[in-house]
Structures are given as C-alpha cells and as structure tokens.
C-alpha cells in the first residue's frame, strides 16, 4: 500500500516493511518463548503437537553440535518452506505473510525453549547454558524469518502487480524487477541461514 497508495519508492517501502515486520516477528518469538517457559513439558506436548511431533529435527531436545551441523538438510527444507509461503502470500497477501511469520516463530521458539529447559535440569550452570544456546541459535532463526518475510513481500508485490497492470505495461516490469530482487534476497538469506546453522551453531554449542 505504501507504493501503490502513497507513491513511496520501492526501496523505502521495502525497508520500512522489513523493519516493522521484523519487530513483529521478534515479538512473536518472544511471546512463544514465554509460553514455552511457563507451561510444563506435558502441556506443551499436548497443546503444541503440530510442533512437537514433526520429527526428530524438531522434537529432539539434543543441543549437541552434531544435531545442527546439517546445513544442506536445513537448506533443502527451508527452500521448500519458502516456496510454500510464497504461494500462500501470493494468494492471501498480508494474511499469508502473517501466517509465515507466526508459524516460523512458533516452531522455533517452542522447539528451542523446550530443548533448553530439558538440558538446564542437568546443566552445571543453567544460566550459561541458556545464554550459549540463545547466542548459537538466534542468528539462524532471525535469518530464516527475514528470508520468509522477503519471499512473502515478493509474492505480495507479484500478486498486486498482476492484478493492477497488464503484462505490456512498463509499471509491471518495475514490479517484476522488485519481485526478482526480493526473491533473490530471500533465497540468499535461506542459504546464509543454512551456513550459519551448519557452522556457527555447532561452534557455539561446543562450549556447553
């Protein structure tokens, strides 16, 4: 709307959208994290079955470096997720973007908080464990969220562009250019997130 209704440049609109939605995403992660900290493990297992029973990549409470040293696996899975969220955002626009952010925030916050809670019980220094785990895993979560956000914005632009302009309209090509740029940025962030998860997370978790 900033571009179509207010006449704002694409770069300025994208910057403001990314900043505002990133803050929203961080708020979602923190909200889910608080829920994960407050509720007992049995309740989490019952209420968040769609997260806890998704497979060993999610329901495992293992914080060993070996668990996260699988960059290609994360890259493949996150690329599939990015494509799905692009489709949802193209169809539902803002609602699709909100779903992408909420899903990603919920999955990672509940998964990681659960893993930290379980490991804190046997840790010599629970606070240090929580701090190292946060530093190790937060960069991947943030990069992944930004990747899905950029991909969703690309889908929204594309959806609005094909609705408002004919394929021969010069404005459609401007929209298409913005879509391609955002799509490349989003996939680049998926790659970067996988690299961070493969190298940074195991490195930091090695201090536990």
Where on the chain are the PLM-derived regions?
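Hydrophobic alpha-helical transmembrane segments and adjacent short intramembrane/lumenal linkers
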Residues: 112-187, 191-192
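Internal active-site segments that recognize and position negatively charged phosphoryl groups
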Residues: 64-110
């Amino acid at each position: 709307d900033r571009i179509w209704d207010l006449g704002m440049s694409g770069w300025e609109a994208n910057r403001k959208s990314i900043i505002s939605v990133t803050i929203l995403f961080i708020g979602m992660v923190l909200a889910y994290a608080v829920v994960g900290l407050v509720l007992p493990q049995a309740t989490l297992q019952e209420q968040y079955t769609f997260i806890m029973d998704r497979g060993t990549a999610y329901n495992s409470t293992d914080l060993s470096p070996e668990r996260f040293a699988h960059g290609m696996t994360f890259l493949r899975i996150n690329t599939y997720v990015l494509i799905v969220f692009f489709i949802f955002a193209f169809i539902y626009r803002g609602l699709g973007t909100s779903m992408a952010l909420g899903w990603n925030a919920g999955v990672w916050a509940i998964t990681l908080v659960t893993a930290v809670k379980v490991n804190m019980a046997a840790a010599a220094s629970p606070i240090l464990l929580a701090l190292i785990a946060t530093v190790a895993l937060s960069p991947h979560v943030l990069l992944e969220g930004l990747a899905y956000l950029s991909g969703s914005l690309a889908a929204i632009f594309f959806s609005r562009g094909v609705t408002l302009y004919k394929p021969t309209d010069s404005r459609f090509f401007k929209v298409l250019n913005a879509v391609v740029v955002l799509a490349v940025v989003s996939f680049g962030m998926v790659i970067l997130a996988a690299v961070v998860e493969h190298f940074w997370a195991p490195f930091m978790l090695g201090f536990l």
